[in-house]
């Protein structure tokens, strides 16, 4: 069945197929890809140390992509549902003051990716009033965004 949102953080992050797909995609086009955000699993930072870092810095987008302009890129993956934590959205709102944010979303059900500007993600959330859930390991609340909505969105 694979990894799900019910698995521990350590298991969820052990192998991130969405980041693999993002790197493959950006390395195949004419752009510069720079790893930017903190990767707790590969940084050597303990969970205790990681929690001492201010939230907005912990939630730094994963990459900078430079083509005709610079974008901060947040990579997200899932099967049928994209889960976006409420607190992460607060941080992304702050990051947009410095650089536009683009989401690279990979669905294992669709077996494809879509790039969608952060503003479109927020519009989808507000337009559809998606239900929320909580991660069992940390009780953090998240929106449940159907991948179908992301992949059929023509403006993203």
Predicted segments, located by residue:
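Intrinsically disordered, low-complexity terminal regions enriched in charged/polar residues
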Residues: 115-156
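Active-site-adjacent loop/helix micro-motif of nuclease/hydrolase catalytic cores
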Residues: 79-89
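A structural signal for short, well-ordered beta-strand segments and their strand-loop junctions
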Residues: 34-35, 72-74, 102-106
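Nucleic-acid nuclease catalytic cores
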Residues: 93-124
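Positions that flank functional sites
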Residues: 41-42, 80, 111
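Active-site metal-binding core of divalent-cation-utilizing nuclease and nuclease-like domains
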Residues: 3-12, 35-69
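Conserved catalytic cores of phosphodiester-cleaving nucleases, focusing on short active-site segments
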Residues: 26, 61-79
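A short, highly charged nucleic-acid-interacting micro-segment common to nuclease
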Residues: 1-24, 29
């Amino acid at each position: 069945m694979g990894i799900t949102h019910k698995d521990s953080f350590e298991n969820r992050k052990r192998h991130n197929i969405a980041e693999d797909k993002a790197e493959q995609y950006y390395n195949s086009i004419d752009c510069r890809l720079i790893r930017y955000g903190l990767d707790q699993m590969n940084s050597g930072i303990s969970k205790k140390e990681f929690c001492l870092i201010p939230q907005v810095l912990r939630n730094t987008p994963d990459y900078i992509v430079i083509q005709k302009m610079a974008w901060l890129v947040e990579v997200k993956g899932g099967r049928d549902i994209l889960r976006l934590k409420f607190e992460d959205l607060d941080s992304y709102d702050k990051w947009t003051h410095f650089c536009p944010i683009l989401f690279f979303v990979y669905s294992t059900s669709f077996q494809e990716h879509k790039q969608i500007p952060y503003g479109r993600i927020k519009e989808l959330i507000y337009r559809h009033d998606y239900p929320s859930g909580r991660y069992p390991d940390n009780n953090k609340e998240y929106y449940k965004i159907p991948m179908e909505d992301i992949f059929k969105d023509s403006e993203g």
